[in-house]
């Protein structure tokens, strides 16, 4: 701490010194105004005894007058007469002479550029480095891990909800850190490394902090991207320093977040023969082999891209254990909601079970954001507490985007959108395999949609049948089918529906083996690439041109079948379609309670006719 307090004074003194040197170098010291006079005038002043004192240099004379002339009391002139001293003596004028010495000025002129460069180097590599926590140029090889102790993490297993099945695995790590002797009596030791795998936002970092908080041990937290800097060898040096610090603080936990930034498969995407990231990874592998798990150092790491990690990093003896932290189920979402609800003021009869039901697929981070959004919605309407309607509005905002109530559609466009959305809603309510309809709206959203039909599942699904996929195609095609049925033509409003339907149909044929024509072969596989998520999913096609043609025909057949089913269903329910569209135009948003025809009912026609909607 003393060093930190002295740093401002050090920088202050350095700045003052530089200012002084600059003043000397560039002559910034102020001097009195000097009047240059001819040597003959100087001799006259000397004879008239108007000169008080003189300073004689090698080539010039500086003097001061007894009385100022023209506002100047100091004068200078060129030294001409070598016998000047005799005349000065006769006149009784005191004078002095010096031999001009330019040694100091010469030396300072030579050193000034060097001193300026040294000062610039100091500020760049020391002052800036301290602000960024680098410790200066000499400290670039030091670990940048943030160290927490028990009271710093402020997180325990009580703050981690929705992953009860994972807590059992993690409790073993806490038990080892608290009681190593109990495991050592049978020769057991904790796994060297534990890899937390899961989608973003599922709580991997929170779990690591909870382990440290439960075990009450130091917690070294660092991101995988913080190891590599612009200097070669810095990453490897930081890995060594991190493990050295951990050994000194044992028992402790090292947590490396975003391990894929550091442990990416070697040779993939490397354009140099000796890549800096590979050096850092090699040093990490060496440290994992070198430290003894009985020392009490536990290594935790987290990633959402395990497929790109180097196989050498995942072998036994390094990361021995992988723990999947997946999206929570309904029970898990309920537990997570209860944790975050303590941070807001909500109505006592708030139905948390209902909120958990309408939020399938949301992660812990999503649910935390949902609770905050609901509180914002309640504040916006000046409510005293947060209610279920606020959570419903927050879910719609997350799913469909922000309402654009200022957008004004033409009357004919609103009518097309109303029939389009009612077509989706009636198709979903007529097919038992589909999720029930919760709300239909023709209010434009920021996500780019002019309307939306919101369906909410009643439970989590882990398997999807062929019938469910085919029915989903019917719901997607029903919007365009309604437009064609009512107006005799179609619009561009179904572009997104057609794209999603085509993707489902293609996966049904090529990935799921559900095509009666092509059989149960998997024709396309997804491979992991090196570049980001947009290019991460690369399709590998293992089929001939003839098979490609058959795939295209099969996909087209599925879409035509779905469109025919949707058209037949809406023809049978034409009265409901017209009534629902009129109500939607009047109210803009309706629910099954306001329009009972949206309640689930299995009444799909047994037969249908294929219709060409492009004409």
Swiss-Prot record:
Cofactor remark: Binds 1 zinc ion per subunit.
**SUPFAM superfamilies the record matches:** FtsH protease domain-like (SSF140990), P-loop containing nucleoside triphosphate hydrolases (SSF52540)
| Example of a GO MF term | ATP hydrolysis activity
- Subcellular localization: Cell inner membrane
Regions that span the bilayer: 9-29, 105-125
Q: What is its main location?
A: membrane
> Which amino acid positions bind Zn(2+), per UniProt?
420, 424, 497
Q: Which residues lie on this side of the membrane: Periplasmic?
A: 30-104
Q: Which GO terms describe its biological process?
A: protein catabolic process; proteolysis
Its GO CC terms are: plasma membrane
Instruction: Give binding positions for ATP.
Output: 198-205
Which PROSITE patterns does UniProt cross-reference here? AAA
Entry's SMART domains?
Answer: AAA
Q: Where is the active site?
A: 421
How does this protein sit in the membrane?
Answer: Multi-pass membrane protein
Q: Which cofactor does it need?
A: Zn(2+)
Residues in the Cytoplasmic compartment per record: 1-8, 126-615
Q: What InterPro entries does this protein's entry cite?
A: AAA+_ATPase (IPR003593), AAA_lid_3 (IPR041569), ATPase_AAA_core (IPR003959), ATPase_AAA_CS (IPR003960), FtsH (IPR005936), P-loop_NTPase (IPR027417), Pept_M41_FtsH_extracell (IPR011546), Peptidase_M41 (IPR000642)
Carries keyword Thylakoid?
A: no
**Keywords, alphabetical:** ATP-binding, Cell inner membrane, Cell membrane, Hydrolase, Membrane, Metal-binding, Metalloprotease, Nucleotide-binding, Protease, Transmembrane, Transmembrane helix, Zinc
Pfam families cross-referenced by the UniProt entry: AAA, AAA_lid_3, FtsH_ext, Peptidase_M41
Q: Which family does it belong to?
A: In the central section; belongs to the AAA ATPase family. In the C-terminal section; belongs to the peptidase M41 family.
Instruction: Name the job this protein performs.
Output: Acts as a processive, ATP-dependent zinc metallopeptidase for both cytoplasmic and membrane proteins. Plays a role in the quality control of integral membrane proteins.
Record's subunit section: Homohexamer.
| Name this polypeptide is given | ATP-dependent zinc metalloprotease FtsH
UniProt organism field: Pseudomonas putida (strain ATCC 700007 / DSM 6899 / JCM 31910 / BCRC 17059 / LMG 24140 / F1)
Q: Which gene encodes it?
A: ftsH
């Amino acid at each position: 701490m003393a060093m930190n307090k002295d740093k401002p004074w050090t920088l202050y003194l350095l700045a003052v010194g530089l200012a002084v040197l600059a003043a000397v170098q560039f002559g910034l010291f102020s001097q009195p105004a000097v009047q240059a006079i001819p040597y003959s005038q100087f001799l006259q002043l000397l004879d008239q005894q108007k000169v008080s004192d003189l300073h004689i240099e090698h080539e010039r004379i500086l003097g001061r007058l007894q009385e100022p002339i023209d506002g100047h009391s100091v004068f200078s002139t060129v030294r001409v007469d070598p016998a000047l001293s005799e005349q000065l003596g006769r006149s009784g004028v005191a004078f002095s002479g010096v031999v001009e010495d330019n040694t100091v000025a010469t030396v300072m002129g030579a050193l000034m550029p060097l001193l300026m460069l040294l000062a610039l180097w100091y500020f760049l590599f020391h002052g800036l480095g301290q602000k960024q926590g680098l410790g200066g140029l000499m400290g670039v090889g030091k670990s940048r891990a943030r160290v927490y102790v028990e009271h710093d993490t402020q997180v325990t297993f009580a703050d981690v909800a929705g992953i009860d099945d994972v807590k059992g695995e993690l409790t073993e790590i806490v038990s080892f850190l608290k009681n190593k002797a109990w495991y050592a009596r049978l020769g057991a030791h904790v796994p060297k490394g534990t890899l937390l795998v899961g989608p973003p936002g599922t709580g991997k970092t929170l779990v690591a902090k909870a382990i440290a908080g439960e075990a009450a041990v130091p917690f070294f937290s660092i991101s995988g991207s913080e190891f590599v800097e612009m200097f070669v060898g810095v990453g490897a040096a930081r890995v060594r320093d991190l493990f050295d610090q951990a050994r000194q603080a044992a028992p402790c936990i090292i947590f490396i977040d975003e391990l894929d930034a550091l442990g990416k498969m070697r040779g993939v995407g490397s354009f140099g023969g000796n890549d800096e990231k590979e050096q850092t990874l090699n040093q990490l592998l060496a440290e994992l082999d070198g430290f003894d798990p009985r020392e009490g150092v536990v290594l935790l790491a987290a990633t959402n891209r395990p497929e790109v990690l180097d196989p050498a990093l995942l072998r036994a003896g390094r990361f021995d254990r992988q723990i999947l932290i997946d999206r929570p189920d309904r029970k898990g979402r309920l537990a997570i909601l209860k944790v975050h609800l303590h941070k807001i003021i909500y109505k006592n009869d708030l139905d948390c079970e209902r909120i958990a039901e309408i939020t399938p697929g949301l992660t812990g981070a999503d649910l935390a954001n949902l609770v905050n959004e609901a509180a914002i919605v309640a504040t916006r309407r000046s409510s005293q507490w947060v209610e279920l309607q606020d959570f419903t509005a927050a879910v719609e905002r997350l799913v469909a985007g922000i309402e654009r109530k200022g957008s004004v559609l033409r009357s004919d466009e609103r009518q097309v959108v109303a029939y389009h959305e009612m077509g989706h809603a009636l198709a979903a309510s007529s097919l038992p395999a589909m999720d029930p309809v919760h709300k239909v709206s023709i209010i434009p959203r920021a996500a780019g949609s002019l309307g939306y039909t919101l369906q909410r599942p009643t439970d989590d699904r882990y398997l999807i049948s062929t019938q469910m996929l085919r029915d989903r195609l019917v719901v997607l095609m029903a919007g365009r089918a309604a437009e064609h049925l009512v107006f005799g033509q179609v619009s561009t409003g179904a572009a997104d529906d057609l794209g999603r339907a085509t993707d489902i149909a293609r996966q049904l044929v090529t990935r799921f083996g559900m095509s009666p024509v092509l059989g149960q072969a998997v024709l396309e596989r997804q491979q992991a690439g090196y570049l980001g998520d947009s290019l991460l999913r690369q399709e590998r096609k293992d089929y001939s041109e003839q098979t490609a043609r058959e795939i295209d025909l099969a996909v087209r057949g599925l879409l035509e079948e779905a469109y025919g089913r949707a058209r037949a269903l809406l023809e049978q329910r034409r009265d409901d379609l017209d009534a629902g569209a009129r109500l939607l135009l009047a109210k803009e948003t309706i629910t099954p309670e306001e329009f009972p025809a949206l309640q689930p009912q299995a009444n799909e026609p047994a037969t249908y006719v294929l219709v060409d909607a492009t004409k």
